[in-house]
């Protein structure tokens, strides 16, 4: 195909005719007005928003979960330390109460002390808690020796022990009055692991030592994270020692970290009761993998509870969430890049190629290649521009041929002037047609340029007019370009709908977070149930108080009956003395009434037998009073274990103990008086036997003696009735005491259950509330990012209701 020459004359396009094409070229070369640049910038902004939002969400979620894990490990360490402290405090309270018992007081023998420690262990509700009980005399031997006066260990009774085998010996000389000292854990000769608690006995000379078993204490350590193990360490300035461990007994007694002192292990040196967390414990130097740890001190002891958890287990959930979120971000980024790269890059490349071809045609290079292998609207646009180029070249060639013919006709002979003139006219007509076509093409190109400029500015609703031109090539170009714009507009609408879907999903996530917060209210109901359990515990304590009041009344009845027995016994003694005097007066006058005297002697012997029976009953009362005293001691011990909730019960138990001691003393008085009556009765019998040899007394004196001893018999019957009343009252006392002990056990169990449930529910409610608040914040942030994406897409003006047919114009 030939290229028009520069001297083509008026048939070649003028410089002013190319102005619209120059404008199109200038617009295409402006980066800020380029569709490719805008599309790339929009994709870049979307990528940045998705990446930044995703990274922020995963960082925030990971930090929240890791903080919850750290708090959980700290709370478990504090809970274990509190459990150990409570265990020590219960033991020390029990030892303090037992050491002040009068049976360890002044003027008590070794046998009395031995009987007391035996009964102390027998009365213990949980016998496995106590390994051995000793009463030691620290004043015998050297500073590191002591003599065991009484013990539940038969082999240890009466032996002298040293601190080498019994570590508590070193502490016996430094204990103050009404104080309790506990040792570090150690192993007894029998292999049991124990902790000794000791206090000065009531006689201020001996020391009561109770060895509590501590072997199963480590079994109660909590482990909420897989692979967690707990150790209780005693740090010193020289070295460290593991006192308890739930990771096996091999570590017990060994250094926490070999060749390290307290100051060389910062976590142990700075541990407090509130608990601390560290990601890099010093213990890692001797472990086979990475661990995190929480430290806290045991209240009142120089012991540190160290809870270790494997790092991969402690932060497993946060690592999974981090991986999931990063994977989601990667998929989203790859999807956006693929969509943008596929649609935007190919479309932009085709538009740039088409723009370059149009610029070449504008410059007069009609041989430029405008072919395309695409079969879509872009390919049709290439074909339309190619057809337009071919039509324009054909018209230019025709104009050139007409001009050449006119020139040849002018050079012909004058004879053919008319034909040449006609040819000139035809040439002028052809020129006029060509100029009209050029003007039409210029106007159409200007309109097309305006539409392209608007589209470059983001207005995808504009369309090229295809119906106001008679040129089929220009109409085909407009139709193809309009169809391409319709596809672009549809793509932008799809992206906007995607942004709307993200915003809608964010709102649904906010609703889900609200539902989770309402679920927290159910946790509050669980706390109310715990409060109900506490009320039930209080009601049971009121019942125990009433039962102990009944027990006190029964003891008072025992005392009243004992007074009645004492009064009747006194009257019996007076009557017996009257009978004795009467018998002495009748000795000289009653020789004739020997048979009557024999009958009197038999009555006195019967009275002696009845007095023996009364003595047995009084012994029974003494035994019951002693048992009541031991029950009161046990009640004191249980009240000490119940902490503050058992204060009222302890007061009642003390009153029961005092009444039992008074009853025992009254029974002793009765027994002594009965002994005196029996002695007097024996003397009366002897005197009556002697009276058989000199019965010179008168009949009247003998009758007085019979009457006196008849009165003695009557009073003896009354004494028996009083003793029976004492027996009945004592039975009531025993029943009330048993019921009080049963209720005390139920109250202790309910108290433990209430404390455990309250602690668990409180921790769960706090953690859930914190997590729901943080998740709600993250969802709100994601919703805001979706709104930002919608704002960026709103820069493109589209019509969602438009049909994507290429015939619509704007």
Swiss-Prot record:
Q: Which residues lie on this side of the membrane: Cytoplasmic?
A: 1-38, 345-810
**Which residues does the entry place in the Extracellular compartment?**
60-323
**Which InterPro entries does this chain map to?**
HAMP_dom, MCPsignal_dom
Q: Where is the composition biased (Low complexity)?
A: 755-774
Glutamate methyl ester (Glu) is found on: 556, 739
Which Pfam families does this entry report, sorted A to Z? Answer: HAMP, MCPsignal
Q: What domain of life?
A: Archaea
Main localization, broad class: membrane
Q: Quote the PTM field.
A: Methylated by CheR.
Where do the segments described as Disordered lie?
403-427, 751-784
**Which residue range or ranges hold the Methyl-accepting transducer domain?**
512-748
Q: Which UniProt keywords apply?
A: Cell membrane, Chemotaxis, Membrane, Methylation, Repeat, Transducer, Transmembrane, Transmembrane helix
- Localization annotation: Cell membrane
Which GO biological-process labels does this protein carry?
A: chemotaxis; signal transduction
Q: Which family does it belong to?
A: Belongs to the methyl-accepting chemotaxis (MCP) protein family.
Against PANTHER family, the record matches this protein to: LYSOZYME-LIKE PROTEIN-RELATED, METHYL-ACCEPTING CHEMOTAXIS PROTEIN MCPB
Q: What does this protein do?
A: Mediates chemotaxis towards compatible osmolytes. Probably transduces the signal from the substrate-binding protein CosB to the histidine kinase CheA.
Q: What is this protein called?
A: Transducer protein CosT
Species of origin reads: Halobacterium salinarum (strain ATCC 700922 / JCM 11081 / NRC-1) (Halobacterium halobium)
Taxon lineage: Archaea, Methanobacteriati, Methanobacteriota, Stenosarchaea group, Halobacteria
Gene name?
cosT
């Amino acid at each position: 195909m030939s290229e028009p020459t520069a001297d083509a004359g008026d048939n070649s396009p003028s410089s002013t005719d190319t102005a619209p094409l120059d404008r199109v070229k200038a617009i295409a070369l402006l980066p800020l007005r380029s569709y490719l640049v805008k599309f790339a910038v929009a994709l870049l902004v979307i990528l940045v928003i998705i990446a930044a939002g995703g990274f922020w969400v995963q960082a925030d979620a990971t930090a929240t979960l890791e903080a919850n894990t750290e708090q959980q490990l700290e709370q478990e360490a504090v809970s274990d330390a509190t459990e150990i402290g409570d265990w020590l405090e219960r033991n020390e309270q029990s030892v303090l109460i037992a050491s002040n018992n009068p049976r360890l007081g002044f003027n008590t023998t070794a046998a009395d002390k031995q009987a007391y420690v035996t009964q102390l262990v027998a009365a213990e509700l949980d016998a496995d808690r106590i390994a051995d009980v000793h009463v030691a005399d620290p004043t015998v031997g050297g500073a590191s020796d002591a003599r065991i006066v009484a013990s539940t260990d038969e082999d240890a009774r009466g032996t002298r022990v040293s601190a080498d085998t019994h570590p508590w010996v070193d502490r016996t000389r430094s204990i103050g009055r009404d104080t309790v000292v506990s040792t570090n854990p150690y192993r007894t000769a029998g292999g049991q692991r124990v902790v000794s608690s000791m206090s000065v006995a009531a006689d201020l000379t001996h020391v009561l030592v109770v060895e509590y078993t501590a072997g199963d204490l480590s079994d109660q350590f909590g482990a909420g994270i897989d692979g967690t193990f707990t150790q209780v360490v005693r740090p010193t300035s020289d070295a460290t020692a593991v006192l308890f461990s739930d990771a096996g007994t091999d570590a017990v007694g060994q250094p926490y970290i070999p060749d390290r002192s307290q100051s060389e292990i910062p976590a142990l040196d700075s541990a407090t009761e509130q608990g601390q967390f560290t990601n890099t414990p010093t213990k890692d130097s001797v472990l086979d993998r990475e661990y995190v740890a929480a430290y806290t001190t045991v209240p009142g002891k120089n012991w540190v509870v160290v809870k270790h958890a494997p790092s991969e287990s402690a932060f497993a959930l946060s690592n999974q969430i981090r991986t999931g979120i990063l994977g989601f971000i990667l998929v989203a980024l790859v999807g956006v890049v693929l969509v943008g790269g596929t649609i935007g890059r190919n479309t932009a490349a085709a538009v740039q190629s088409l723009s370059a071809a149009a610029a070449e045609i504008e410059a007069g290079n009609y041989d430029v290649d405008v072919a395309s292998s695409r079969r879509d609207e872009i390919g049709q646009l290439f074909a339309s521009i190619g057809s337009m180029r071919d039509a324009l070249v054909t018209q230019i060639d025709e104009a050139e041929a007409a001009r050449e013919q006119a020139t040849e006709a002018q050079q012909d002979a004058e004879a053919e002037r008319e034909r040449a003139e006609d040819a000139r006219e035809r040439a002028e007509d052809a020129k006029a047609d060509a100029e009209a076509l050029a003007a039409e093409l210029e106007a159409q190109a200007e309109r097309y340029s305006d539409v392209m400029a608007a589209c470059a500015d983001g207005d995808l609703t504009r369309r090229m007019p295809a119906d106001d031109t008679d040129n089929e090539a220009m109409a085909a170009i407009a139709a193809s370009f309009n169809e391409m714009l319709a596809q672009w507009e549809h793509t932008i609408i799809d992206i906007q709908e995607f942004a709307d879907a993200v915003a809608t999903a964010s709102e649904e996530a906010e609703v889900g977070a609200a539902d989770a917060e309402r679920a927290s209210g159910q946790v509050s109901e669980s706390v109310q149930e715990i409060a109900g359990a506490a009320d039930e515990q209080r009601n049971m304590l009121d019942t125990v108080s009433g039962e102990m009041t009944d027990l006190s009344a029964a003891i008072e009845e025992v005392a009243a009956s004992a007074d009645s027995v004492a009064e009747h016994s006194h009257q019996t003694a007076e009557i017996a003395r009257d009978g004795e005097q009467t018998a002495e007066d009748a000795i000289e006058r009653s020789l004739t009434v020997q048979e009557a005297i024999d009958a009197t002697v038999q009555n006195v012997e019967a009275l002696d037998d009845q007095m023996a029976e009364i003595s047995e009953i009084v012994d029974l009362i003494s035994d019951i009073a002693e048992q009541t005293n031991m029950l009161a001691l046990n009640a004191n011990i249980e009240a000490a274990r119940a902490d503050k909730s058992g204060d009222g019960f302890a007061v009642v138990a003390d009153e029961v103990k005092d009444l039992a001691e008074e009853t025992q003393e009254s029974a002793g008085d009765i027994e002594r008086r009965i002994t005196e009556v029996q002695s007097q009765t024996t003397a009366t019998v002897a005197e009556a036997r002697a009276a058989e040899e000199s019965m010179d007394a008168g009949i009247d004196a003998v009758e007085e003696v019979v009457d006196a001893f008849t009165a003695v018999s009557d009073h003896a019957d009354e004494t028996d009735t009083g003793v029976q009343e004492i027996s009945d009252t004592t039975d009531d006392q025993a029943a009330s005491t048993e019921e009080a002990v049963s209720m005390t056990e139920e109250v202790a169990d309910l108290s433990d259950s209430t404390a455990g449930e309250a602690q668990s529910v409180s921790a769960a409610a706090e953690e859930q509330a914190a997590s729901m608040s943080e998740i709600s914040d993250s969802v709100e942030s994601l919703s805001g990012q979706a709104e930002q994406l919608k704002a960026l897409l709103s820069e493109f003006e589209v019509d969602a209701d438009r049909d994507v047919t290429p015939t619509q114009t704007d």
